[in-house]
Amino acid sequence: MSKEKEVLLNDEIQADEIRCIGDDGKVYGIISSDEALDIANRLGLDLVMIAPEAKPPVCKIMDYGKFRYQQEKKQKEAKKKQKVIDIKEIKLSVKIAQNDINYKVKHASEFLEQGKHVKFRVFLKGREMGSPEAGVALLEKIWQMVEDIADRDKEPLLEGRYVNMLVTPKKKK
């Protein structure tokens, strides 16, 4: 069973009186549901309840198959417009050499140019847990290297055994 609410069609409509609208926008006014069903059958279309909460309920005479197709088409378009955020993670340690930092920053800048978010994670081992400031200092050093091409989304923050910082590509003006 689908998640969307079911739409009442033709004989499923139990209301005595309904407000009826034609496929072309013509307003039939408040008529009995039987009369609206007769009009829909004469036109070879369906009677679809579009506003069951209204008093009286609002029904429209239309081609239900075409209506469903249009709804699915709108949903597909909306889904296409959604942007999936891709986060790349770069792991570091407190005792990383400068050359390795340069290499990791180069990769991070490539990811940022592709429009991806980059999460830097500094792993704290053993006694390093006692001074997470070293991890924060390393992330601040990295931030100075990427600040011209990125915005800092999340400040360096200790989470468990990691010090994390999230950077995002700069917004184009």
Curated annotation (Swiss-Prot):
Keyword Transferase: no
MF (Gene Ontology): ribosome binding; translation initiation factor activity
Subcellular location as annotated: Cytoplasm
InterPro entries with a match to the protein in the record: T_IF-3_C_sf (IPR036788), T_IF-3_N_sf (IPR036787), Translation_initiation_fac3_CS (IPR019813), Translation_initiation_fac_3 (IPR001288), Translation_initiation_fac_3_C (IPR019815), Translation_initiation_fac_3_N (IPR019814)
GO biological process: ribosome disassembly
GO cellular component: cytosol; membrane
Keyword Acetylation: no
Sorted UniProt keywords: Cytoplasm, Initiation factor, Protein biosynthesis
Pfam families in the record: IF3_C (PF00707), IF3_N (PF05198)
SUPFAM superfamilies: Translation initiation factor IF3, C-terminal domain, Translation initiation factor IF3, N-terminal domain
Annotated family: Belongs to the IF-3 family.
Complexes and interactors: Monomer.
Role summary: IF-3 binds to the 30S ribosomal subunit and shifts the equilibrium between 70S ribosomes and their 50S and 30S subunits in favor of the free subunits, thus enhancing the availability of 30S subunits on which protein synthesis initiation begins.
Descriptive protein name: Translation initiation factor IF-3
Species this chain originates from: Campylobacter lari (strain RM2100 / D67 / ATCC BAA-1060)
Gene name, Swiss-Prot/TrEMBL: infC
